[in-house]
Amino acid sequence: KRTVLKLSPKIAPIKIAILPLSKDPQLSELSKKIQKDLINKGNLGKIEYDETQSIGRRYRRQDEIGTPYCVTIDFETINDNSVTIRHRDSMDQERINISDLSQKLTSEIYN
């Protein structure tokens, strides 16, 4: 059974979780850079970083605390500068270019 805290993205305490697919140093470094860049935008609220346990467990943990968007950084990210955004409520996933990430998340959270 999936436990989900369905808060509006506007009021969710943590808006975004940055989740590298593994603890690979390249992925960790890139993930932390993406987190820092999003934080520096200043309008996206609290952005959590988590690289513990399996990606499935991390998704479930974020669902339980109401995080509306998880951004997954994987080995494709290194090659094509794209990340996966996972939507909490629908569990839909979409690939998006890193350069469009901040604008996309801002639009999703506040519109």
Language-model regions, residue ranges each:
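NTP/phosphate- and nucleic-acid-binding module
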Residues: 1-111
